[in-house]
Amino acid sequence: MKVVAVGGGTGLSTLLKGLKNIDSFEITAVVSVTDEGGSSGKLRKELNVPPPGDVRNNIVALAKDEDLLAKLMSYRFSEGSFKGHSLGNLIIAALTKIEGSFSEAIRILERVLAIKGRVLPVSEDHARLVARFEDGEEVIGETNIVRKGGKIVEVRLDRPIDALPEVLEAIERADIIIFGPGSLYTSIITNVLVNGVKDAIKKSKAKKIYVCNLMTQPGETTGYRVSDHVKELERYLEQSVDFVLVNTRKPSEEVLERYRKEGSDFVEIDAENIQNTILAEPFLVEIVDPSDGQRKIRHDSVKLADVIERISRW
């Protein structure tokens, strides 16, 4: 069973941690390349390499010895000239320079870490995300888009870039294509904007699944319900998804209040506005982030994988 997961960031890596435990799944993760924040943004600007952070997260998620590797690859320097950089990002950047290819650097790391599946950047070319807001202003760059806030009317890339042939082949041959979880515009739709991706998805006979976010994202999806997420994704795909996975469990009031202070809120399910097949489950789990001790919410990777495995048998 060939499974392609499209996205970037924490959401996609959470999904992959569950999918890798299903023996029948051959996994390909397709990762966005428009990230401009943090360590990835600095390396992209200073070394002229594609942003390695999302790729690193997803390689670690698919690794067999995840606990040990996560500590090594995710180690972030807190002082000196490397402050803010993770070791994994530096390794990927160095391999890219040595091999002259971002994709080859990833392949080497995949072999070294013995991951289940593969991780592909959607493209090796450079592009920035551009958003046009309801007030008419256009903002360039993911970080600036989120900082601007307001209702996004349209997103595009600042220049045309081509998808890797391996990405298009994986999509066209897939039995299942999963979108998300992850930032709607900056992690998911940004992949669809790359030349060839949308057409490959249209050609594919795969079952198409959207995993909706648990919370809205300030500056990106403020006030969005489940149907708003689905409609926006389908607008850029120019086709419907077959299944929508939504969470039914609300966070504790303490956690919810902290998210609200950051401009984020629980994504409400408005099933009456959704034509797709909805699978509603208590996907939410609360975790303690070891980096800051804060209680945060994530998708339950095991439950997600179980539901997707069930869909694969329908």
UniProtKB/Swiss-Prot annotation:
A Pfam short name: CofD
Subcellular location: Cytoplasm
GO CC entries: cytoplasm
GO molecular function, one term: LPPG:FO 2-phospho-L-lactate transferase activity
Top-level lineage group: Bacteria
TM region(s), chain numbering: none
InterPro entries recorded: CofD (IPR002882), CofD-like_dom_sf (IPR038136), Gluconeogen_factor (IPR010119)
Coiled-coil intervals: none
Keyword terms, alphabetized: Cytoplasm
One GO-annotated biological process of the protein: regulation of cell shape
Main localization of the protein described in the UniProt heading: cytoplasm
PANTHER family, per the entry: GLUCONEOGENESIS FACTOR-RELATED, UNCHARACTERIZED PROTEIN YVCK-RELATED
NCBIfam families from the UniProt entry: CofD_related
Function noted in UniProt: Required for morphogenesis under gluconeogenic growth conditions.
Family label: Belongs to the gluconeogenesis factor family.
Protein name: Putative gluconeogenesis factor
Source species of the chain: Thermotoga maritima (strain ATCC 43589 / DSM 3109 / JCM 10099 / NBRC 100826 / MSB8)
